[in-house]
């Protein structure tokens, strides 16, 4: 399991997890802002 000179898996997982959290946060923020402006 000694890979070549590829990117470490934990870096990929960290970046993917952070990106997913940002997308989910922006989605909820947009929904909350839309709800607040519509009321």
Swiss-Prot record:
InterPro entries: PSII_PsbJ (IPR002682), PSII_PsbJ_sf (IPR037267). PSII is composed of 1 copy each of membrane proteins PsbA, PsbB, PsbC, PsbD, PsbE, PsbF, PsbH, PsbI, PsbJ, PsbK, PsbL, PsbM, PsbT, PsbX, PsbY, PsbZ, Psb30/Ycf12, peripheral proteins PsbO, CyanoQ (PsbQ), PsbU, PsbV and a large number of cofactors. It forms dimeric complexes. It comes from Synechococcus sp. (strain ATCC 27144 / PCC 6301 / SAUG 1402/1) (Anacystis nidulans). The chain crosses the membrane at residues 7-27. It is found in: Cellular thylakoid membrane. One of its GO terms (biological process) is photosynthesis. Pfam families: PsbJ. Belongs to the PsbJ family. This is Photosystem II reaction center protein J. The gene is psbJ. Gene3D superfamilies: 6.10.250.2070.
